[in-house]
Amino acid sequence: DALTSAYGYPPTTITGSVEKDIVMIPPMIGVKVAVSDHRSSNPSGDDLIALATAARRAGLLSGTPGLVTMHMGSGKGRLDPVFYVLDHSDVPAKNLLPTHMLRTPELMDAGVELVKRGGYIDCTAGSDDQAVEDQAVKLFDLLHRNGMNMDHVTMSSDAFGSQPRFNAEGECVGLTYASPKYLHKTI
């Protein structure tokens, strides 16, 4: 399975349209965008409604999930844009999949609220031995919170995705990639 676009909004597509990409290119099951992250293009709630509506329509036509997979950063907005979509549109929570949900305690809290509202969240496995241990502890905490539906929580490796390293000033000082081996270690 694949996603069209990347972090930016408006989305960059192959056919010129999120809907066409999902309907006409068989591996496509949805679209990717970054939210609440210093690397995102800061899509508004209305931008996400338009994106989610397009992905959902295409999913209905193609028999795919029609997901909006959201790279979540540690920004101030947290899941506010996602809750905006749920509060101001008819897009079902199941079409919205925020990732990297163990990034901050506040994001984890918001993830619990999203799951309580019928949504799904994805947690990222560690990217080295210490991070594996840290992520496993966070995941255990998240899964044992009151009202948490474990069937609505997934874990992925971010395998071979770029992994920037930042210094204390927030400057990118290196780039590497995540290995898939840490998914098994985290679980």
What are the functions of these language-model segments?
Residues 6-10:
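Acidic, glycine-rich active-site loops and adjacent beta-strand->loop/helix elements
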Residues 145-187:
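His/Asp/Glu-enriched, well-ordered alpha-helical/loop segment
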Residues 127:
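Residue-level signal for short, function-critical loop segments
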Residues 13-123, 131-152, 184:
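Histidine/acidic residue-rich metal-binding segments in metalloenzymes
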